[in-house]
């Protein structure tokens, strides 16, 4: 038996008593070729799923094997109406997100989506966020592939490793400091969220119905921005997301403020960060640098193993409370995953695309997840069904945010400070001073 981490227990408790969808995440792989028969799928999935312990287990305070596991209770099969384009695929994804996972069974589902144009089909994996401590939905997809290599989406090698703590006394002192620190930070965030006027929140009552959309960005374009400014791909993604939400606020006639929007990021470990997105800045470079600096500061304050040292119920109650805040509290969960090390294949067929599905819950009106696959960085976006207009504004803003950064990453572009003095290249990391020309930018799939 394996225990939950403190943070994942909190995500599990975010499911409400009426069994609305809890914090579920997912990924969709678009596969070349005709969809296999149900018998073929059942044979392959049964063999591969049973090799992944979490997929045949249920949990309370720890993971235990589920008696009488039946694959057919977890697999759904749907066919898209003609023309089978991406708009129809996105509707099918949204439909899958509206269906809650059964908490009395292993917390995952697989949807086989047939009828995509171009002789293609798709497989959607949805898992509860409490399983993500062991694997993400993208990891699970990789484990189902022909090479069964769960490390296909493994973490980047440059991720900082947290050294183990020493004696029991230092561990206890660290535990106390972290508990007090995270409690204060989250309680402060909750207090601020409740006090924010509703007019500043991405709006309207939250429903169980969802919309899904994706924005694709050439990975070379993102790499050019990273190279120019000495930042990470995750920084670029968050800066683009910031522009997206700034666009929404301006479209509503609201003035973006420094405390307008906060995002919950679950890191590669078991911790979470709650940084503000700098929507108040119009300058895309200033936004990018602010995101980068805040991410670095959050990383220094919160080691990956932080919430594993936090008392279980304390952390669980915090996440539970955060999920129940009004919409203006936390309106987005931004997550990311590194690109796979090679192209994936399923039942002999090539995976053309992988689309991320952000954490989805009744209390969260908007979610964005970011995933790199092949030569693309993909933003997956979910929103309330009634928020179609604002979702399009968000998409447009993300596209604009990437386009502006790509344009500024060209060496022929001179960067100026606010008083029109040229920005010194010495202010940039060495990697930024070796910038390279930009390449074509974002495109949305509607």
Curated annotation (Swiss-Prot):
Residues annotated as the enzyme's active site: 129
Keyword DNA damage: no
Record InterPro entries: Acyl_transf_WS/DGAT (IPR014292), CAT-like_dom_sf (IPR023213), O-acyltransferase_WSD1-like (IPR045034), O-acyltransferase_WSD1_C (IPR009721), O-acyltransferase_WSD1_N (IPR004255)
Protein origin, superkingdom: Bacteria
Keywords per UniProt: Acyltransferase, Glycerol metabolism, Lipid biosynthesis, Lipid metabolism, Transferase
Induction trigger: A possible member of the dormancy regulon. Induced in response to reduced oxygen tension (hypoxia) and low levels of nitric oxide (NO). It is hoped that this regulon will give insight into the latent, or dormant phase of infection.
Region annotation (Disordered) ranges: 425-446
Keyword Glycosyltransferase tagged: no
Family classification: Belongs to the long-chain O-acyltransferase family.
The protein's name: Putative diacyglycerol O-acyltransferase Rv3371
Record organism: Mycobacterium tuberculosis (strain ATCC 25618 / H37Rv)
């Amino acid at each position: 038996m394996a225990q939950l981490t403190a943070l994942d227990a909190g995500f599990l408790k975010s499911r409400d008593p009426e069994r609305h969808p809890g914090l579920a995440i997912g990924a969709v792989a678009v596969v070349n070729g005709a969809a296999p028969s149900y018998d073929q799928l059942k044979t392959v999935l049964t063999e591969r799923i049973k090799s992944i312990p979490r997929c045949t287990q249920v949990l309370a305070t720890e993971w235990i094997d589920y008696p009488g596991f039946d694959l057919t209770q977890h697999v759904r099969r749907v066919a898209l109406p003609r023309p089978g384009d991406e708009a129809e695929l996105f509707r099918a994804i949204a439909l899958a997100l509206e269906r809650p996972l059964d908490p009395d069974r292993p917390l995952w589902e697989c949807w086989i989506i047939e009828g995509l144009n171009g002789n293609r089909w798709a497989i959607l994996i949805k898992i509860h966020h409490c399983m993500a401590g062991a694997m993400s939905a993208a990891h699970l997809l990789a484990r189902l592939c022909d090479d069964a290599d769960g490390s296909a989406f493994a973490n980047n090698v440059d991720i900082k490793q947290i050294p183990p703590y020493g004696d029991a006394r230092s561990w206890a002192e660290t535990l106390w400091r972290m508990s007090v620190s995270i409690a204060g930070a989250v309680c402060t965030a909750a207090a601020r969220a409740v006090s924010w006027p509703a007019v500043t929140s991405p709006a309207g009552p939250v429903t169980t119905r969802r919309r899904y959309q994706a924005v694709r960005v050439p990975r070379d374009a993102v790499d050019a921005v990273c190279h120019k400014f000495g930042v990470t791909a995750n920084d670029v993604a968050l800066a683009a997301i910031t522009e997206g939400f700034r666009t929404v606020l301006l479209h509503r006639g609201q003035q973006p403020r420094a405390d307008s929007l906060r995002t919950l990021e679950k890191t590669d470990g078991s911790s979470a960060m709650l940084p503000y997105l700098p929507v108040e800045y119009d300058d895309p470079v200033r936004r990018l640098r602010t995101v980068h600096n805040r991410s670095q500061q959050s990383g220094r304050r919160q080691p990956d193993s932080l919430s594993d040292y936090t008392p279980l119920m304390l952390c669980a109650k915090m996440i539970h409370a955060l999920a129940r805040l009004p919409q203006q509290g936390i309106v987005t969960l931004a997550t990311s995953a590194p690109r796979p090390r090679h192209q994936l294949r399923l039942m002999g067929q090539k995976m053309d695309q992988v689309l991320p599905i952000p954490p989805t819950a009744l209390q969260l009106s908007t979610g964005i997840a970011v995933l790199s696959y092949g030569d693309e960085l993909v933003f997956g976006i979910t929103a309330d069904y009634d928020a179609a207009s604002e979702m399009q504004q968000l998409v447009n803003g993300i596209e604009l945010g990437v386009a502006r950064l790509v344009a500024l990453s060209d060496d022929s572009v001179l960067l100026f400070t606010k008083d029109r003095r040229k920005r010194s290249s010495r202010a940039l990391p060495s990697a930024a001073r070796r910038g390279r020309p930009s390449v074509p930018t974002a495109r949305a799939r509607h």
